[in-house]
Amino acid sequence: MRFFVSCAKGLEYLLVDEVLALGAVGATATVAGVNVEGGLCDAQRLVLWSRLASRVLWPLAAFACADEDALYAGVAALPWVEHVLPGQTLAVDAHVSGEAITHARYAAQRVKDAVVDTLRDAGVVRPSVDVEHPDVRLNLSLRKGRATLSVDLGGRALHHRGWRQAPHAASLKEHLAAAVLLRAGWAKVYAEGGGLLDPMCGSGTLLIEGALMVADVAPGLSRYADPDAISHVSVAERPVLLPSRWRGFDVVAWEALVVDAQQRARRGLAELRPVLHGSDIDPRALGAAFANARAAGVQDAIEFVVAGIDVLPAVFEPHGVVVCNAPYDVRLAANPGLYRHLGDALRRVVPRWRAALVCGSSPLAFATGLRAGKKYQFFNGALECVLIVCDPVVPLAREAGGAQALSEGAQMVANRLRKNVQRLKKWRMRAGVECYRVYDADLPEYAAAIDVYQEVDGARRLFLHVQEYAAPASIPEGDVRRRRHELLAAVRAVFDVSVAQVALKTRQRGKGGSQYGCFAQRGEFFHVCEHGALLRVNLFDYLDTGLFLDHRPLRARMAREAVGKRFLNVFCYTGVASVEAAVAGAAATTSVDLSSTYLHWCTDNFALNGQGGVRHRLVQADALAWLEAERGQYDVIFCDPPTFSNSARADDFDVQRDHVRLLRAAVARLTPGGVLYFSNNFRRFRLDVDAVAAFAQCEEISPVTIDLDFSRNTRIHRTWLLWR
C-alpha cells in the first residue's frame, strides 16, 4: 500500500532515511513529503516514532474531481459506516491547488457535508465537528483534477510532542530541531562520549529533542500521553491514548508498538548521561525550558544557566556538538553583530567541537565568521532558514602556509565569476533556477563553459561542471595547463568548493558513440530540481550530465502545454522533458531513445517523482524508424536529435541530411491542433524551409527558448515550432 508522509520543505531526504530505518518497504521523496510503501502497521509505527514527519496520511480513496459536485459524489460513494462510529467527532483538512475549487475551507466543508449526509441516510447519528481534537481527522488533497482523501492517522500535527508546557516566542518546531540534530550527527557524537551545547537555548527545544533522541524515547509517547499523567508520571509509564479513533485503526498493533516503545524508553532514560548544556540571557526563557524538560522527563540530563553568549557555560566533554537557533526574524531583531559575537564565542570556548547553527540567511551565516563545511535550507513555518554545519568550529590549517593567493590570471577569472553570479542573482531568485551557466568563455584566453549544479538532498552541495574548449594548436601546452589551473583555482575560490566538487572535461568535436564513453569511474549521482521535478545527474562519468541546461525554458513551455495531453519525446536522452511534463500533469508520455543507459536513467527520473506505470511509456528504438512505423497520435512532440550518430543497431543519422524526413514523420503523428518542437545545436544547420512547407507550418522561436544565463551564446541551440 502506498501512503503519504508530509514534512517541512527541506527535510524530505532526511525523512526518507528515517522512514526506511523504521521498516517501510520503500520510500520516494517528493516536494514537502515522502511517498511510502508499507502496511498500516508501518504507518502507525511512523506516527509513534517519526521525529521528522508532519502528518501520516492513510488513503481512503482517489478519484477524478472536476468540480464541487464531483467532490461531493466521490466522498459520498465511500462506505462511511465502516470508517466512523455513531456520535464521533470529525475534522477535515483540505489542500487545493489550481482547481475549479479554489478555497480549501469550502472544499473541506463539502467533504464534511458528504460524510454527514451519507451517515444520516444510513440511519447513523451524525458526527459533530471538533477541529482541535477530533476522533477522526480527514485530509483532502485536490490537485490537477484529482482528489485524494485520507485519514490523518496521527490526529494532529506530529511536531507537537506533548511536553511543551511553556512556549517561548523564538521556539523552533520540534521536528525541525530533530532535523538540526540529525544533520549535526548528534547521536553518533553522544555515543562516542560527547556533549551538546545550546548557547541560545530559549525554551529548550533543541536540548530536549537531543536528550529524547539519544535516550531512544519515541515522540508519540508524550504526544498521546494521558494529559492527567504528564505532571507526575514518567514518560515511560504514562498511559498512551489512541491517536485516531478511525474504525480502521489497528488498535492491537498500536498497543504492541507502545509497549515496545515504553520498554526502550525505560532503558534509555535510565542510561541517559547529563552531558547537555543550555544557556540564555533571558531568565523567563530558562524557566520555560526547565518546565518543558521536566514534562519530557529529561530535566536531570540538562544543565540550564542564565548567561549571554559572551559567557558560555563551562563544558567538560572533550568533544561535542553546538546547536543554536539564533534570532533571525524582524520580531526577534536579528543583526549581524549578534552572529559575529556568537562565532567569536564558539571559537574561544569550543574550537574543536562541531557546530550546527540555524541562521536566517546566508549573509547572517557568513557574519559568524565560521567556515561552513555544509549548508542546508529548510523552512521554519513561513521563514526560510539556512543551517550551517562547521566541523570543527576552528578548522585545522589546510597547509603550513595557509590558503594560496590567486595568481593575477586566476583573480581576473574570479572577478568575472563574481560579477556573473551577481548579474544572474535576481533572475535566478525570481525564476527558481538552481542549476545554471555562470561563465562561457567570457575571457577568451580562459575558454570554458562553467555550469553550477545545486544538490537538493543530502548536504545540498554545490557542484561545478567545467567544460574546457579545445585550445588551438598554436597555443603552447604549458600555457594551456597554466590557464586551466588558474581557471579551476578561481572556481574553487569563488564558490568555496573542494576539488572533489569540480568536474573538468575538455570539449572536442564529438565522434559517433563518444557520448556513451565514461570519463571517470566515480559513480556519483546526485539529485537536482528543475520546475518542481527531481532529476538525477552525474557530472563526472559521462560526456554530458543528464540535464541540458540550455533547454530549460523550452521544457517549461512544453510542460505547460502538455497538461492533460499526450506528450512524445523522441531522442529523449534521460527523459527530463518527459518527466517535467508528467509532473506538470500530462495525461500520458512516451519517451524514445536507442540507448538503454539513458532509458534506465529516464526510469530513475520518473521514479524520483513518483511517476511511471502504463501512462508513461519508455521505448528503446531508433527514433526515426520508430516514428515512421508508429500509428499513435500526440498533442505535443519534442524532437531534439543529435548532430550525428551511428550505431550497430540503427542506420547512421545526420541532422542536416535527415531532418526533412524526420520532421515529416513526426508531424504525421500530431493530433489536430497538436504542436511539434524541433531543436538542435548544430551551428551550421540550415532548415530546408521549402521542403518542410510541403507538410507543415513552421516558425523559428529560438530567442524565446534562451534564458538569461545563456544570453552570451544565443546560438547554443535553435528551435522551431511546427504544426499542421
UniProtKB/Swiss-Prot annotation:
Specify the THUMP domain's residue ranges. Answer: 42-153
Q: Which CDD domains match?
A: AdoMet_MTases, THUMP_AdoMetMT
Tell me the SMART domains matching this sequence.
THUMP (SM00981)
PROSITE patterns, alphabetized:
THUMP, UPF0020
Give the catalytic activity. Answer: guanosine(2445) in 23S rRNA + S-adenosyl-L-methionine = N(2)-methylguanosine(2445) in 23S rRNA + S-adenosyl-L-homocysteine + H(+); guanosine(2069) in 23S rRNA + S-adenosyl-L-methionine = N(2)-methylguanosine(2069) in 23S rRNA + S-adenosyl-L-homocysteine + H(+)
Q: What does this protein do?
A: Specifically methylates the guanine in position 2445 (m2G2445) and the guanine in position 2069 (m7G2069) of 23S rRNA.
Q: Read off the HAMAP family from this record.
A: 23SrRNA_methyltr_KL (MF_01858)
Q: What is this protein called?
A: Ribosomal RNA large subunit methyltransferase K/L
| Source organism of the structure | Xylella fastidiosa (strain 9a5c)
